[in-house]
């Protein structure tokens, strides 16, 4: 089970609702003092504007982390002794599923044979319809299946109750 603190889940939901109708993205870290949500910049609109042939989708149906920002946030997390729990993004007006594009980006070099780009890190997809969170699902790499599969999540308090 992937542990997500209630306050962290609420922060990610709020980000998804505030960003609607565009996809949002971010990182959930585990720190010694609890989980930390870091909102990230979705650069998909800029990519689409710069080259609509190469990037036909805009931020309403796609997301892309700002690579420099992601590198800096993960560096800061490493320095603080934090661990990445998961990456999250939203699906405005769509269900909570892990798309082929999501899978490709989560794989090292986009190749199944190379495995996940971030071993041990899960992915949360938040479905938002008309500024209301309808569903959310987590996905993690399954070595036997050689694929990302839906994985249950819950709060740490619920697991210890």
Question: What would you call each of these model-derived segments?
Answer:
Residues 1-84, 92-161:
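Conserved beta-strand-loop surface patch within small alpha/beta domains used
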């Amino acid at each position: 089970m992937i542990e997500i603190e209630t306050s962290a889940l609420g922060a990610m939901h709020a980000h998804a609702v505030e960003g609607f109708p565009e996809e949002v993205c971010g990182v959930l870290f585990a720190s010694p003092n609890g989980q930390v949500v870091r909102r990230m910049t979705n650069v998909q609109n800029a990519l689409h504007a710069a080259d609509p042939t190469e990037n036909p989708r805009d931020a309403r149906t796609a997301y892309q982390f700002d690579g420099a920002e992601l590198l800096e946030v993960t560096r800061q997390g490493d320095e603080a002794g934090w661990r990445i729990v998961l990456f999250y993004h939203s699906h405005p007006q769509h269900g909570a599923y892990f798309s082929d594009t999501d899978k490709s980006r989560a794989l090292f070099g986009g190749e199944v044979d190379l495995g996940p780009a971030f071993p041990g890190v899960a992915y949360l997809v938040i479905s938002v319809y008309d500024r209301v969170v309808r569903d959310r699902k987590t996905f993690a790499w399954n070595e036997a299946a050689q694929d990302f599969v839906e994985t249950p999540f819950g709060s740490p308090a619920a697991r210890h109750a």
